Amino acid sequence: MMNSKRTFYQPITMTKKMIKNTSYEGERPLFASHHLRLEDVTIYPGESALKECSDIEAVRCEFRGKYPFWHNDGLLIENCLFREGARAAIWYSRNLRMKDTRVEAPKMFRDMDGMVLENVVLTDALECCWHCRNAELRNVQADKGDYLFMHGENMDIDGFRLNGNYSFQYCRNVVIRNAEIHSKDAFWNTEDVTVYDSVVDGEYLGWQIGRA
């Protein structure tokens, strides 16, 4: 079952440089930044605004450019909005906490290690959360979520609503509570998945599973 040594979000207690009430656009405007807090900042179309960064906090920010957070370590994202253009926003990163945030962009997370999502709405969750491990979700809603959580590992989910097919395929060590999952072809090729107090609605569930 769940790995007792799992590591979700671990805050970094360092003094941070503050950036407030401004905007950026273009290619990599904040590349390789460290110990940074953004408040009321807009990232306009461009690419990789905060690539290769660490210990970043973003509060009440809006993201419109693609790939804003790639190869990051230590992210706190709170009360933010990711527009459709901010596709594939957080990839190849570790140690993320996101709360009270709306995501309108597809393919949001990929190859993550250690992430906590609290009160998050994903309106276009297509191909989201692939190859993510050590994840905790609390009160998360995902729509248009085809292929959500492909190859996920060590996941603890409570208070979850999903509309999307082919979810949780090839997942391992997953606990789900208080969920409403509308998904055909879900839980294929999974191992050690436990679902409590939930509704799972869809055809062809759980083919070729290990322990469940």
Predicted regions and their residues:
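N-terminal segments that cap or nucleate solenoid repeat domains
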Residues: 2-63
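Short glycine/acidic-rich loop motifs that flank beta-strands on beta-rich extracellular proteins
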Residues: 26-31, 46-51, 65-73, 85-92, ...
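Conserved small/polar residues in nucleotide/adenosyl-binding loops
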Residues: 212
